[in-house]
A protein has these predicted regions:
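Sec-dependent signal peptide recognition
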Residues: 3-11
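C-terminal motif of bacterial Sec signal peptides marking the signal peptidase cleavage site
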Residues: 15-18
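Bacterial signal peptide processing site
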Residues: 20-23
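Short amphipathic, basic-aromatic surface patches that mediate peripheral association
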Residues: 33-44
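Short coil-to-beta strand junction motifs in C2/discoidin
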Residues: 45-54
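Exposed aromatic-hydrophobic patches
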Residues: 97-104
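A short, solvent-exposed beta-strand micro-motif common in secreted/extracellular proteins
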Residues: 108-118
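Short acidic/polar inter-strand loop motif in beta-rich domains
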Residues: 117-125
Length: 140
């Protein structure tokens, strides 16, 4: 009976170590599922318009959350400084659904998302997602 317990615990240990080793060997990634509403980003005539979305890989979210839209959009390298690991740009048309696979640096702790809406003052243009490094997830 003791041999069965030892074998069982050895098996569990090896399975857990295998999962940990896989995280060390395979680069982390995240699937970002971004869906633009059909009426997104209306122009002055109320017609939907495309929107540009930036995805930032960050080591910390502090600087990202303290900056205004134009500072991040126009001077992201300057204002985010050492927190910025990488940046992706995605352009979405009204009604479009985009699944983007981001291969992330092991240093990435957060994803900062900025949408360049026409009416920034009345928009929810910023989103921050804490990266789960223990698994590979889809963020919507």
């Amino acid at each position: 009976m003791k041999q069965i317990y030892k074998s069982f615990f050895l098996f569990i240990f090896l399975v857990l170590m295998g999962c940990s080793a896989a995280n060390l060997v395979v680069d982390p990634y995240a699937d970002l599922e971004i869906t633009a509403n059909h009426n997104i980003n209306p122009d002055s005539n109320g017609r939907p318009s495309p929107v540009v979305v930036y995805v930032f890989e960050l080591t910390s979210n502090t600087l990202f959350e303290s900056q205004d839209f134009f500072s991040i959009y126009e001077e992201h390298e300057k204002v985010l400084g050492p927190d910025l690991v990488n940046k992706y740009e995605i352009s979405l048309t009204p009604g479009q659904k985009e699944i983007y696979q981001a291969s992330m640096s092991p240093k990435t702790e957060y994803l900062g998302i900025v949408a360049a809406f026409r009416d920034i003052e009345n928009s929810n243009w910023r989103q921050v997602i804490k990266v789960d490094k223990t698994g590979y997830n889809t963020y919507q």
